[in-house]
Amino acid sequence: GLFDIIKKVASVVGLASP
């Protein structure tokens, strides 16, 4: 769902900017 995409993006951003 859309929320899953948001979580995935948030995870990528979190890894990129810890």
Curated annotation (Swiss-Prot):
Localisation per UniProt entry: Secreted
Organism name: Ranoidea citropa
Disulfide-linked positions: none
Domain of life of the organism encoding this protein: Eukaryota
Keyword Nucleotide-binding: no
Claim: Secreted is one of the keywords in the record: yes
TM segment ranges: none
Name of the featured protein: Citropin-1.2.4
Example GO BP: defense response
Pfam families (UniProt xref): Antimicrobial20
Principal location class: secreted
UniProt keyword annotations, A-Z: Amphibian defense peptide, Secreted
